[in-house]
Regions:
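Histidine/acidic-residue-rich, glycine-tolerant segments that coordinate divalent metal ions
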Residues: 60-61, 82-84, 88-100, 106-115, ...
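A structural signal for isolated positions on well-ordered beta-strands in alpha/beta enzyme cores
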Residues: 52, 130-132, 290
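Non-cysteine beta-strand/loop elements that form the S-adenosyl-L-methionine
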Residues: 74-76, 188-190, 346-352
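Acidic/His- and Gly-rich active-site-bordering loop/insert found
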Residues: 2-101, 106, 110-113, 117-125
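Active-site beta-loop-alpha junctions enriched in small/polar residues
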Residues: 28, 78-80, 136-138, 166, ...
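Metal-dependent amide/peptide-bond hydrolase catalytic core
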Residues: 210-389
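Short beta-strand-to-loop capping motifs
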Residues: 64, 192-194, 259-261
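Divalent metal-coordination and catalytic microenvironments
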Residues: 23, 62, 75, 105, ...
Length: 389
């Protein structure tokens, strides 16, 4: 038997599928979500929400107060797209060259709007609902900027929830994990400086490219020799930018790294070792290495009690077979900044399907699975009515 909430929401499913596809056609990257945020604000205003714009530039918060309840619930969706070219071949594919909703944030935004319309119309809760539409998740600091701009000072929350669609998991299955669920992320640049010169007389130079290669190799010892094998960590040198000519020894190299961990102490150890190794390796060649921490986000940790509520609501809506535990993974999510401020919160996944030909996120052929809109909206509504009762 279908749950009554699903039946009530299904009436408007086609409307929100169409909205999701319109968002998909007009993708906007981090901190440039002007058209998206304007449409979000317009719809929330039409449905009776108090609308606030401007946090983190393009962020939107919609507030709905119902009854005399004192509790305050936050639901968050991300809005930004990726700087990628889409190759899905869908009729609603991106109309913006080099911009693409390749992670499903068009679907996340629409899912929360789908729930917002129902909750404002039915109003079967008592308390304050804060709907948070966040920019720049793909940059991994849009959430941090919203918090720094006073998100929780202006819009207090006693609990907060976020979700993400997940290709590779069974369709509609809710994935939960207590504690550490997603990795911290740190982006670092290492600038190596040596002495340039002609490739025919290397004895008069300090080869910055050679130094960068030694640093790259030495960094791989961190995970295998400085970190216990029981704690996952990743150190990846993703870019080494040196010269262009075959007969010139470079005096300057820029290295770009990413670091992922599931433990803050491990994170600190890895970052310190990167610094120590880079500086020492450079000095051994009479070069210098300067490190810059470009940005970082913390480990995403879920509160077990709040997770239990998600599990309870999801089981009632979809059945126990559609709720399960997931392993932690080394991807990162800046919703972690919000959970860091408000540890009574939960981030969960919704399976987008595990067919062999289903594209993963960040793949040029990816498209959000519209079947998830109803699932996600029902879960948002169920959580709201459960928490604010």
């Amino acid at each position: 038997m279908t749950h009554p909430l699903l039946e009530a929401l299904q009436v408007n499913e086609a409307q929100f599928i169409a909205l999701r596809r319109r968002f998909h056609q007009q993708p906007e990257i981090g901190f440039e979500e002007h058209q998206t945020s304007s449409e979000v604000a317009r719809l929330l205003g039409e449905w009776g929400y108090e609308v606030h714009r401007g946090l983190a530039g393009t962020g939107v918060v919609g507030t709905l107060r119902v009854g005399e309840g004192k509790k305050r619930l936050g639901l968050r969706a991300d809005m930004d797209a990726l700087p990628m070219q889409e190759r899905s071949g869908k009729p609603w594919a991106s109309q913006v060259d080099g911009r693409f909703h390749g992670c499903g944030h068009d679907g996340h935004t629409t899912t929360l709007l789908y729930a917002a319309e129902y909750l404002a119309r039915i109003r079967q809760f008592t308390g304050t609902l804060q709907l948070i539409f966040q920019p720049a998740e793909e940059l991994l600091y849009g959430g941090r900027v919203m918090v720094e701009d006073g998100l929780f000072d202006q819009f207090p929350c006693d609990a907060i929830f976020g979700l993400h669609n997940m290709p590779g998991q069974p369709l509609g299955k809710i994935g939960l994990r207590d504690g550490a669920m997603m990795a911290s992320s740190d982006t670092l640049h290492i600038e190596v400086k040596g002495v340039g010169g002609h490739g025919a007389v290397p004895e008069h130079t300090v080869d910055a490219t050679l130094v960068a290669c030694h640093i790259t190799l030495a960094l791989q010892s961190i995970v295998s020799r400085n970190i216990t094998p029981f704690e996952p960590a990743v150190v990846t040198v993703g870019s080494i930018q040196a010269g262009h000519a075959p007969n010139i020894i470079n005096d300057h190299v820029l290295m770009k790294l990413t670091v992922r961990t599931l433990n803050e102490q491990v994170r600190e150890t890895v970052l310190q070792r990167i610094h120590d190794i880079a500086v020492a390796q450079a000095e051994s060649f009479n070069a210098t290495a300067t490190l810059t921490h470009v940005n970082g986000s913390p480990v995403l940790r879920n509160d077990p009690a709040t997770n239990a509520m998600v599990r309870e609501v999801a089981t009632a809506l979809f059945g126990a077979e559609q709720v399960g535990e997931v392993k932690p993974f080394m991807g990162s999510e800046d919703f972690a900044f919000m959970l860091e401020q408000h540890p009574h919160g939960s981030y969960f996944t919704i399976g987008a399907g595990d067919e062999p030909d289903r594209c993963m996120v960040h793949n040029p052929g990816y498209d959000f699975n519209d079947a998830l809109l109803l699932t996600g909206a029902a879960l948002w509504c169920g959580l709201t009515e459960r928490y604010l009762r």
